[in-house]
């Protein structure tokens, strides 16, 4: 059905419901039973009904069981198991449809076929309750699921028939609970919506526990019948009102499909449901007055007054239009059910009213406190019930303490389910408790639902037996108990374990009905963890579908929304305000459903999880320890929650994931379900820890791994590039020689050059990524730094002998290359490796004398391209480098050769873009640095690359761009670089002055280059200007005598006329007209020419002035520049080319880095 059809059905259903509601208000006197005798609606025209029946089974098949209130009969009935198969078979559809429905219900917009939507939403109501029960009853037998479906059918009938009453009563009970129920339903729907597929599957598997779902859905059922979707949705409406609002489709689904429900059952069911819904409210009193499961007064007054009048009031309130507890609910006006729920809620909101949640919170707070204890009892009972299995006897038995407790627990379970499903408003608190009781209810819902149903009937033990769900549960539980009770027995203990925490958390959870979100976070230690575990473990379970349902059930709790729940779970411990986000509730709701999902999905790794369960606490502790060790783990609880959820994920995906290695023993340690507490803590910790393993551990370990990897990568790069790490050690020997003079300089440069070396070469990228890291491990980074000549120096120290032996051979090839390409080849490949080229020599060392020479040449080509300004110098220097590499090993004086290594420059020509990219990398590296000297070194290195880029533009005829802008911008960068370190400052070091000299020389030669690029234009301008001035002077001289004194200080009268002519003549640059001597007009073009001429010539003036300044300053650093001139050849003002300048400067920078120990 498309939306339009659903909308039409929705409108019709809305009208019908409104009428039924109005009629229902009148139809149910205070003393009248909530629901009339169940009757079977024979109308089969409804597609939804037909589909629902086909999926859920025929009422005729189930009515005897449903109608029979005796638990024994239901328990004895194996028939549900048969329907279970059918239903489970149908369940896939049911699941799909329900998913669609619940999905739609989440949206409150007609999404799927109206029938399927209504069906699915009926289912989703049932399933959501089922999810709750499923969540609670992590693993259920298909029999109970089918039975539950039949119950749903019968319930749908009772819903439909007793719809008004049940809806009213349910709305009433639900409306107190509905704020919760709606939110929980909405979250359940959203959960079930997200979890529906899994939840449905799980429900199929867990349907036995779906009795909760059934009674939930029946409780919703009343809505569902008359307002099927409305009933189902109202609960969801509350919490997800806005999102659910769009799901009027849910309203459509309550067709006549589920036609026959016994009013008794419905009423009892309603009682149980409303009790369950009011459970949170009733729980306090239900503890005291479990027998008095009188929803009306309880929900309304939170007191145990089960008067029919109260029910009527509730019904009236239900039918009454109230502001939605979640105001957003009204927005989906189209969703009639919200209308109905709201009216009910509004009526109740006399109790809860618009502040229903608040009241409900207060009522629930009061009730919640009682409910807390009840929930605790409930949890305890759930644990014991889970441990006991069904505790049908307990159900039937008054359970004075356990009974009361179990009733509360059942009511709490139901209330948790109902309040989860029907009251997600509480779902926060009951989501915590509900989550808690969900996990409890998972086991305890199957069993607690049995008791809870019996518990709600406990005031009426017969109703307990009469409860369809109870009977059904009892019926199913026999089947259920074998699979589920074992799980439950495990889970109960774990639930009991959880319950203890939950009770604590529940106390806060119930204490904060409004803070139900917080209650989840209130019980973050366990509830949140449990929820998170559930949610995250749910994930894990989804991952490992193979795991047993029981294990999965619990673990799958939060699977559907594992990530959300994780975050919320992690956040829940902090804020836990997730009800609206539905994460806690969703987690609570999704936890059971996810458990089923996990049961279904997570079943693939059941052994691991069970085993993990066996070592839950050790695992949890291990995980905690691991998580604690993990930096990203904020707190062990959060991490635990994360870890637990990640454990569930990890446990499921453990084998594949690294998590398995981390927690494999604890996770995989064979665990017997019997260790419930371990299982519980296992769930908490394990569920989270696998996730943590996966998410936290792997990310954490990855960063850790990455950091070492980065370092290793650098080392590899060093080996690949020049293999300087070794060389670097040798140059330090040279440095040792140099240390006396240059140690301070080296110290300063060490930091700067470390980063600069990193960024300059191939490691620039690595350095960029780990610039901070590289700075920290600069010694390592030095080895791996981009400028590995420095590294080669140190490595030469380390392997001075090797370098001595090896470098000569590499040096020879390099020498020949460099000498050949000395000036002509500005072909050095990349400035990246110019310093690396000296490392190139070291790379030669690394690779072996011959291989090293080849590698050095290769590295030179690749990375030290163009770094050797003068190859002859390089050749000379390389021989010295070998020698210098050798001498460094034998520290002599600071003589340049022994202490410094020469970079190997690549003579290959590269495109301008290649150099430009390199320059940008270096500049960006410099931008990220904090040390001013190091920053200046990097900037100057970038300047060299920019110079090479301009040179490539200049040399390449194919380049359309002029190198002038590149050089001009580079000059500005040099000016900025010089501002970083003022050589005139009192604290200026020798390294600062040397760097300044290099900057000045680059700037001077760039100015000279700029002048030469524009020299021809300047000559033209000079000629034109000279002629203009000459003509202008002659013209001005002629008229002046005639004008005499008259012209003095005044423009000639003729000048205006002449100026146009003058401009014309001047524009041609030819003759000049004379104006009065005082007013000679110069054409605009002349001004431009004059300005351009001045600019071009000023470049030459700057070049000469700056060169002189550099020469003067270099005298203070004679040794350094004498050595540099010797190695690279001196720079000559009017003769050196850009390639010479680039290589000279880069070699000087390399030494500066070495001296400053920026590279080792």
UniProtKB/Swiss-Prot annotation:
Subunit: Component of the super elongation complex (SEC), at least composed of EAF1, EAF2, CDK9, MLLT3/AF9, AFF (AFF1 or AFF4), the P-TEFb complex and ELL (ELL, ELL2 or ELL3). Interacts with ELL2; the interaction is direct and leads to stabilize ELL2 and prevent ELL2 ubiquitination and degradation. Interacts with ELL3; the interaction is direct.
Alphabetical GO biological process terms: regulation of gene expression; response to endoplasmic reticulum stress; spermatid development
UniProt-recorded name of the protein: AF4/FMR2 family member 4
InterPro entries xrefs: AF4/FMR2, AF4/FMR2_CHD, AF4_int
Keyword Transcription regulation: yes
Residue positions, PTM Phosphothreonine: 669
Basic residues: bias regions: 594-607
Similarity remark: Belongs to the AF4 family.
Entry comment on modification after translation: Dephosphorylated at Ser-544 by the PNUTS-PP1 complex, promoting RNA polymerase II transcription pause-release.
Summary of the tissues where the protein is detected: Highly expressed in testis by Sertoli cells, and at low levels in other tissues.
Low complexity: bias regions: 172-189, 229-247, 425-457, 641-657, 831-859, 880-895, 1059-1070
Organism: Mus musculus
Location relative to the cell: Nucleus; Chromosome
């Amino acid at each position: 059905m498309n939306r339009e059809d659903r909308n039409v059905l929705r409108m019709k259903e809305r009208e019908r419901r409104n009428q039924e509601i109005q009629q229902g208000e009148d139809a149910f006197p205070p003393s009248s039973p909530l629901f009339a005798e169940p009757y079977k609606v024979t109308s089969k025209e409804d597609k939804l009904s037909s589909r629902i029946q086909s999926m859920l089974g025929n009422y005729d098949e189930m009515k005897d069981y449903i109608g029979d209130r005796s638990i024994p009969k239901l328990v004895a009935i194996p028939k549900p198991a048969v329907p279970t198969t059918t239903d489970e078979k149908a369940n896939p559809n049911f699941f799909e449809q329900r998913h669609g429905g619940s999905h739609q219900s989440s949206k409150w917009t007609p999404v799927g076929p109206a029938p399927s939507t209504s069906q699915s939403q009926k289912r989703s109501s049932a399933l959501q309750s089922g999810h709750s029960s499923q969540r609670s009853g992590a693993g259920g037998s298909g029999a109970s699921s089918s039975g539950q479906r039949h119950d749903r059918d019968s319930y749908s009938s009772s819903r439909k028939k007793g719809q008004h009453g049940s809806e009213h009563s349910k709305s009433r009970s639900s409306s107190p609970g509905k704020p919760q129920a709606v939110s929980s339903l909405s979250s359940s729907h959203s959960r079930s919506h997200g979890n529906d597929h899994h939840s449905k599957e799980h429900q199929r598997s867990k349907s036995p526990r779906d009795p909760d779902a059934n009674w939930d859905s029946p409780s919703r059922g009343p809505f569902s019948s008359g307002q099927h979707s409305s009933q189902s949705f109202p609960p969801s409406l509350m919490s997800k009102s806005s999102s659910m609002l769009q799901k009027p489709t849910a309203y459509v689904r309550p067709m006549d499909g589920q036609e026959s429900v016994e009013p008794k059952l419905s009423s009892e069911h309603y009682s149980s449901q409303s009790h369950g819904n009011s459970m949170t409210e009733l729980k306090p009193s239900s503890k005291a007055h479990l027998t008095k499961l009188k929803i009306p007064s309880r929900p309304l007054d939170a007191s145990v007054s089960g008067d029919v009048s109260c029910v009527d009031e509730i019904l009236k309130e239900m039918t009454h239009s109230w502001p939605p507890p979640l105001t957003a609910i009204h927005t989906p006006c189209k969703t009639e059910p919200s209308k109905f729920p709201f009216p009910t809620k509004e009526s109740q909101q006399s109790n809860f009213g618009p502040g229903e949640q608040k009241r409900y919170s207060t009522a629930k707070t009061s009730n919640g406190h009682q409910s807390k204890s009840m929930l605790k009892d409930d949890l305890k009972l759930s644990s014991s019930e889970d441990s006991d299995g069904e505790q049908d006897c307990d159900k039937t038995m008054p359970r004075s303490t356990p009974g009361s407790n179990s009733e509360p627990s059942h009511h709490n379970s139901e209330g948790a389910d109902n309040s989860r499903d029907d009251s997600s408003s509480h779902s926060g608190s009951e989501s915590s408790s509900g989550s808690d009781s969900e996990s409890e209810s998972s086991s305890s819902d199957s069993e607690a639902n049995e008791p809870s149903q019996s518990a709600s009937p406990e005031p009426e033990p017969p109703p307990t037996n009469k409860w369809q769900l109870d009977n059904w549960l009892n019926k199913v539980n026999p089947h259920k108990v074998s699979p589920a009770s074992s799980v439950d027995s495990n889970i109960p203990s774990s639930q009991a374990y959880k319950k203890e925490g939950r009770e604590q958390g529940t106390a806060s959870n119930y204490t904060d009905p409004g803070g139900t979100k917080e209650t989840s976070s209130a019980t973050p230690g366990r509830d949140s963890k449990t929820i998170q575990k559930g949610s995250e473990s749910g994930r894990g379970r989804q991952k490992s579908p193979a795991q047993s349902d029981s294990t999965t059930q619990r673990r799958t709790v939060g699977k559907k929304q594992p990530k959300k729940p994780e975050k919320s779970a992690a956040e829940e411990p902090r804020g836990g305000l997730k009800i609206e986000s539905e994460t806690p509730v969703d987690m609570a709701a999704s936890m059971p459903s996810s458990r089923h999902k996990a049961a279904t999905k997570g079943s693939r790794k059941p052994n691991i999880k069970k085993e993990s369960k066996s070592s839950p606490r050790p695992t949890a502790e291990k995980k905690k320890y691991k998580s604690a060790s993990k930096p990203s783990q904020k707190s062990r609880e959060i991490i635990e929650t994360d870890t637990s959820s990640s454990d569930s994920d990890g446990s499921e995906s453990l084998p594949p994931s690294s998590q398995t290695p981390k927690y494999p023993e604890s996770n995989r340690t064979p665990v017997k379900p019997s260790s419930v507490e371990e299982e519980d803590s296992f769930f908490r910790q394990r569920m989270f820890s696998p996730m943590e393993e996966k998410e936290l551990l792997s990310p954490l370990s990855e960063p850790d791994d990455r950091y070492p990897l980065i370092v290793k990568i650098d080392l590899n790069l060093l080996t690949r590039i020049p293999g300087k790490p070794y060389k670097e050690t040798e140059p330090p020997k040279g440095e040792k020689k140099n240390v006396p003079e240059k140690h301070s300089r080296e110290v300063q440069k060490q930091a700067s050059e470390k980063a600069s070396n990193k960024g300059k070469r191939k490691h620039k990228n690595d350095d960029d990524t780990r610039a901070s890291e590289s700075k920290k491990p600069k010694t390592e980074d030095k080895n791996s730094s981009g400028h590995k000549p420095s590294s080669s120096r140190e490595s030469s120290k380390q392997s001075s002998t090797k370098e001595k032996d090896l470098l000569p051979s590499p040096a020879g090839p390099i020498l020949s290359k460099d000498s050949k390409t000395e000036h002509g080849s500005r072909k050095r490949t990349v400035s990246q490796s110019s310093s690396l080229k000296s490392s190139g020599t070291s790379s030669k060392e690394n690779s072996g004398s011959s291989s090293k020479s080849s590698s050095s040449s290769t590295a030179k080509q690749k990375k030290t391209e163009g770094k050797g300004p003068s190859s002859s110098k390089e050749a000379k220097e390389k021989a010295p480098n070998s020698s210098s590499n050798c001498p460094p090993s034998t520290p002599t004086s600071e003589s340049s050769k022994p202490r410094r290594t020469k970079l190997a420059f690549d003579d290959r020509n590269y495109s301008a873009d290649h150099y430009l990219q390199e320059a940008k990398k270096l500049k960006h590296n410099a931008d990220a640095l904090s040390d001013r000297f190091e920053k200046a070194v990097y900037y100057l290195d970038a300047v060299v690359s920019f110079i090479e880029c301009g040179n490539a533009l200049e040399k390449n005829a194919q380049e359309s761009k002029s190198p002038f802008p590149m050089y001009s911008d580079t000059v500005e960068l040099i000016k900025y670089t010089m501002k970083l370190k003022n050589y005139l400052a009192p604290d200026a070091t020798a390294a600062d002055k040397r760097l300044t000299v290099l900057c000045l020389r680059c700037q001077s030669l760039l100015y000279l280059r700029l002048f030469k690029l524009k020299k021809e234009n300047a000559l033209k301008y000079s000629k034109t200007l000279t002629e203009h001035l000459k003509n202008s002077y002659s013209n001005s001289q002629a008229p002046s005598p005639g004008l005499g004194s008259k012209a003095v200080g005044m423009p000639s009268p003729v000048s205006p006329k002449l100026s146009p002519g003058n401009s014309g003549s001047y524009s041609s640059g030819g003759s000049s007209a004379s104006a009065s001597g005082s007013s000679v007009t110069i054409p605009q073009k002349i001004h431009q020419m004059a300005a351009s001429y001045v600019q071009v010539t000023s470049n030459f003036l700057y070049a000469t002035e700056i060169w002189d300044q550099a020469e003067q300053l270099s005298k203070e650093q004679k040794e350094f520049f004498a050595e540099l001139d010797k190695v690279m050849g001196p720079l000559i003002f009017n003769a050196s080319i850009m390639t010479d300048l680039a290589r000279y400067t880069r070699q000087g920078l390399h030494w500066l880095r070495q001296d400053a120990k920026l590279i080792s």
